């Protein structure tokens, strides 16, 4: 599926009451290698590229298992920090909390994110975030990025009990929005399997943010396919 150009997007312009964003790698970057190195340094560990590779070899399959409902968030937390727990003597929940608060200060808005949030807010469109990330990080990160004033709703899978792409998490978001028609909500995310498939299951229009130009899985059909967040201005903002 090709990315749409600005002219094609403008021809697809539609009025949305809500924009619902994924957080990591959609609104924010996520430099986990830096956060983990800082966490390890607190305990006198010189964190190497090999340490990071070993961590991700465990961490990434655990996130897939969580998204597929095969493990819960507590199991994910405990298993991904098993090595650091052994090396530091600190329990996994403590290590995870420290990492999340570190990441809240490290994450930066991606190009075009602030401008889109400001413009949508100014046009009277309400803004939500729906994330599989850990709850402790979310509000501090919004404050650190100075965008909390634009966000009307924060939905965190850890608190709701269902991870994306579970339809129930998106339905929980709709309830918190006071039940708008799903087609008046645009779900925007970088992960076709969680953000786009999950939003579509709930009846929402979807925008796949694909800055690296990856191939779209055959089972996923986003409403819009974009390379840059600023392309959404043509879709969601009223013409001047």
PLM-predicted stretches and their roles:
Residues 9-57, 87:
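Active-site neighborhood of HAD-like aspartate-dependent phosphohydrolases
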Residues 29, 129-131, 208:
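Hydrophobic residues in well-ordered beta-strands that form the structural core
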Residues 33-41, 74, 78-82, 135:
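An amphipathic alpha-helix signature
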Residues 44-54, 85-98, 150, 181-182:
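Short, surface-exposed acidic
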């Amino acid at each position: 599926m090709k990315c749409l150009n600005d002219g094609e997007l403008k021809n697809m312009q539609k009025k949305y009451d809500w924009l619902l964003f994924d957080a990591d790698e959609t609104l924010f970057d996520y430099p986990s290698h830096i956060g983990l190195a800082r966490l390890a340094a607190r305990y006198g560990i010189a964190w190497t590229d090999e340490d990071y590779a070993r961590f991700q070899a465990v961490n990434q399959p655990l996130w897939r298992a969580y998204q597929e409902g095969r493990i819960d968030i507590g199991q994910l937390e405990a298993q991904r920090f098993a090595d650091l727990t052994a090396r530091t003597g600190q329990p996994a929940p403590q290590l995870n909390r420290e990492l999340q608060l570190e990441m809240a200060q490290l994450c930066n808005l991606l190009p075009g994110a602030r401008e889109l949030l400001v413009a949508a807010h100014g046009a009277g469109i309400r803004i939500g975030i729906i994330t599989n990330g850990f709850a402790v990080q979310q509000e501090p990160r919004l404050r650190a990025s100075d965008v909390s004033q634009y966000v009307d709703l924060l939905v965190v899978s850890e608190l709701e009990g269902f991870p994306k792409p579970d339809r129930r998490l998106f339905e929980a978001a709709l309830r918190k929005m006071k039940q708008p028609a799903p087609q008046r909500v645009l779900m925007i995310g970088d992960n076709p399997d969680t953000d786009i498939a999950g939003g579509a299951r709930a009846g929402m229009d979807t925008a796949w943010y694909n800055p690296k130009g990856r191939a779209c899985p055959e089972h996923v059909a986003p409403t819009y396919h974009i390379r840059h967040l600023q392309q959404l201005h043509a879709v969601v903002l009223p013409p001047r």
